[in-house]
């Protein structure tokens, strides 16, 4: 840390939209409503997933983790944000800013990896549906979620010190509503291209990773000539396909705009509940191209599905 940052114990000033008090009141009301909806909605999802044994499946296990991430996002951002919008005090302590940056980056990185995991889970559910429950075992799903959280911790552990050690030439005004990495980088008075490139690499790869399986699924259905399946798959893939480019553009935009949109991370995310891709247990409920006689798996389907479902029923009661 440079000598000009020796006064690091001084509080940062979160500028936000403090020059427009009328806008602050509107933002306060809107963000408060979305915070309440986020807290109530995600809490209800988690409780439902825990209490209903029928939802102890891989897809809903990942969904429960995503809901928990949303709750953590809201808890780490909303209190300070609402405090700044609702009162004259616009400051945040140095240590509070570091903690907010670390938690924000950790949760954001974890969510990026988790969305990629959820997308490929849907890929396995469609393309290997007869063996889905055998492939996506509880132990594997728990490992994937653990990897997502570890990636988030690692990325935040690497990037936070690099961001806070940038020379700021005594600047204390953060041109944002919270201590986010692009806003803190914008305060620096030294070259930041390397830090920005490192920041962009982990998040920039997740939108293509999450969107990659869906064009393949649509192309496979088109090649089979199943019009109903193409229409159904398009509806199911649309949330992921819309969310992925939006995430990538948001990463690029944050490096050029000084004041990102207020409460952006507090809005409910699309693509969280791809519930129309549930794995069906009986062949008569499956689309024509997934019938056993066409897959050549008449003998092992019941055994494979039974083992997978028994494994989830016994193993997820303690994890969901």
From Swiss-Prot:
Topological type in the membrane: Multi-pass membrane protein
Transmembrane segments: 30-50, 58-78, 98-118, 140-160
Glycan-carrying positions: 5
Keyword set includes Transmembrane helix: yes
Keyword Glycoprotein: yes
Disordered: annotated span: 267-320
GO terms classed as biological process: detection of chemical stimulus involved in sensory perception of smell
Listed Pfam families: 7tm_1
Entries under SUPFAM superfamilies matching the protein: Family A G protein-coupled receptor-like
Protein name from the UniProt record: Putative olfactory receptor 2W5 pseudogene
Species of origin: Homo sapiens
Chain's gene name: OR2W5P
């Amino acid at each position: 840390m440079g000598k000009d940052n020796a006064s690091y114990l001084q509080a940062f000033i979160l500028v936000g939209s403090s020059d427009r008090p009328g806008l602050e009141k509107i933002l306060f009301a809107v963000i408060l409503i979305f915070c309440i909806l986020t807290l109530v909605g995600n809490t209800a999802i988690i409780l439902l997933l825990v209490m209903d044994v029928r939802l102890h499946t891989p897809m809903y296990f990942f969904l429960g983790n995503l809901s928990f991430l949303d709750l953590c996002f809201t808890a780490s951002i909303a209190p300070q944000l609402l405090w700044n919008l609702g009162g004259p005090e616009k400051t945040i302590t140095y240590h509070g800013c570091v903690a907010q940056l670390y938690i924000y980056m950790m949760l954001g990185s974890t969510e990026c990896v988790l969305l990629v995991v959820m997308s490929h889970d849907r890929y396995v559910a469609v393309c290997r549906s007869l063996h889905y429950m055998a492939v996506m075992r509880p132990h594997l799903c728990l490992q994937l979620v653990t990897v997502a959280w570890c990636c988030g911790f690692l990325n935040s552990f690497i990037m936070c010190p690099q961001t806070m050690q940038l020379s700021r030439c005594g600047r204390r005004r953060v041109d944002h509503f919270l201590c986010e990495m692009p806003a803190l980088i914008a305060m620096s008075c030294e070259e930041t291209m390397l830090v920005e490139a490192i920041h962009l690499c982990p998040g920039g790869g997740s939108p293509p990773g999450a969107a990659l399986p869906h064009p393949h699924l649509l192309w496979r259905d088109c090649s089979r000539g199943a019009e109903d399946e193409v229409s159904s798959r398009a509806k199911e893939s649309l949330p992921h396909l819309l969310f992925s480019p939006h995430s990538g553009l948001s990463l690029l935009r944050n490096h050029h705009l000084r004041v990102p949109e207020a409460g952006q991370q507090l809005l409910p995310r699309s693509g969280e509940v791809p519930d129309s891709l549930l794995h069906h247990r009986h062949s008569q409920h499956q689309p024509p191209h997934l019938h056993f006689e066409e897959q050549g798996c008449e003998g092992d389907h019941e055994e494979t599905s039974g083992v997978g479902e028994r494994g989830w029923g016994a193993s997820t009661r303690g994890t969901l």
